[in-house]
Amino acid sequence: MGTLDTKGFTEEQEALVVKSWNAMKKNSAELGLKLFLKIFEIAPSAQKLFSFLKDSKVPLEKNTKLKPHAMSVFLMTCESAVQLRKSGKVTVRESSLKKLGANHFKYGVVDEHFEVTKFALLETIKEAVPEMWSPAMKNAWGEAYDQLVNAIKSEMKPSS
């Protein structure tokens, strides 16, 4: 179930993703937080999807639960992108696609949320590696993200 056709992800795209990920990896905690701050700036209502943010009076960047969550999402997204061509499918560490799909279903994540996240991810990467950024790199990360999202969506149903 967790495998998807990755023919759309070329060797050139893989090289761009790997090169930029290698440059960003050491800052993944900071970049993950930037990603989520961008998401909430674009769509403030998305904060309601996170139980640990619902009634929090703490500024987002100081929230002790947001930082580790943001880092793990950023890491998983980027590492999934790097592995895409090598493994021929979307691979995720830590948590299975079934669990990711069930959680996204349970919390009411919809297509628009994935679109906002994609935009925020591409902006975060663009700011992280401006000297490498190009239309080709944007397309490579966009393709990798779309394939991860399609894999998650294929598992978005109530957990059994």
Curated annotation (Swiss-Prot):
<feature type="short sequence motif" description="Homodimerization">
    <location>
        <begin position="111"/>
        <end position="123"/>
    </location>
</feature>
<keyword id="KW-0408">Iron</keyword>
<dbReference type="InterPro" id="IPR009050">
    <property type="entry name" value="Globin-like_sf"/>
</dbReference>
<keyword id="KW-0813">Transport</keyword>
<feature type="binding site" description="distal binding residue">
    <location>
        <position position="69"/>
    </location>
    <ligand>
        <name>heme b</name>
    </ligand>
</feature>
<dbReference type="GO" id="GO:0046872">
    <property type="term" value="F:metal ion binding"/>
</dbReference>
<keyword id="KW-0349">Heme</keyword>
<dbReference type="InterPro" id="IPR000971">
    <property type="entry name" value="Globin"/>
</dbReference>
<keyword id="KW-0560">Oxidoreductase</keyword>
<protein>
    <recommendedName>
        <fullName>Anaerobic nitrite reductase Glb1-1</fullName>
        <ecNumber>1.7.2.-</ecNumber>
    </recommendedName>
</protein>
<dbReference type="GO" id="GO:0009877">
    <property type="term" value="P:nodulation"/>
</dbReference>
<feature type="binding site">
    <location>
        <position position="99"/>
    </location>
    <ligand>
        <name>heme b</name>
    </ligand>
</feature>
<dbReference type="GO" id="GO:0020037">
    <property type="term" value="F:heme binding"/>
</dbReference>
<keyword id="KW-0479">Metal-binding</keyword>
<keyword id="KW-0536">Nodulation</keyword>
<dbReference type="Pfam" id="PF00042">
    <property type="entry name" value="Globin"/>
</dbReference>
<comment type="function">
    <text>Phytoglobin that reduces nitrite to nitric oxide (NO) under anoxic conditions (e.g. during flooding or in waterlogged soil) and upon root nodulation. Required for general plant development and during nodulation, especially for the onset of symbiosis. Monitors nitric oxide (NO) levels during early phase of the nitrogen-fixing symbiosis and buffers oxygen in functioning nodules. May not function as an oxygen storage or transport protein. Has an unusually high affinity for O(2) through a hexacoordinate heme iron because of a very low dissociation constant.</text>
</comment>
<dbReference type="GO" id="GO:0019825">
    <property type="term" value="F:oxygen binding"/>
</dbReference>
<feature type="binding site">
    <location>
        <position position="65"/>
    </location>
    <ligand>
        <name>heme b</name>
    </ligand>
</feature>
<feature type="binding site" description="proximal binding residue">
    <location>
        <position position="104"/>
    </location>
    <ligand>
        <name>heme b</name>
    </ligand>
</feature>
<comment type="subunit">
    <text>Homodimer.</text>
</comment>
<keyword id="KW-0561">Oxygen transport</keyword>
<dbReference type="InterPro" id="IPR012292">
    <property type="entry name" value="Globin/Proto"/>
</dbReference>
<dbReference type="GO" id="GO:0016491">
    <property type="term" value="F:oxidoreductase activity"/>
</dbReference>
<dbReference type="GO" id="GO:0009609">
    <property type="term" value="P:response to symbiotic bacterium"/>
</dbReference>
<dbReference type="GO" id="GO:0071731">
    <property type="term" value="P:response to nitric oxide"/>
</dbReference>
<feature type="short sequence motif" description="Homodimerization">
    <location>
        <begin position="41"/>
        <end position="45"/>
    </location>
</feature>
<feature type="binding site">
    <location>
        <position position="51"/>
    </location>
    <ligand>
        <name>heme b</name>
    </ligand>
</feature>
<feature type="domain" description="Globin">
    <location>
        <begin position="8"/>
        <end position="157"/>
    </location>
</feature>
<feature type="site" description="Homodimerization">
    <location>
        <position position="138"/>
    </location>
</feature>
<comment type="similarity">
    <text>Belongs to the plant globin family.</text>
</comment>
<dbReference type="GO" id="GO:0005344">
    <property type="term" value="F:oxygen carrier activity"/>
</dbReference>
<dbReference type="InterPro" id="IPR001032">
    <property type="entry name" value="Leghaemoglobin-like"/>
</dbReference>
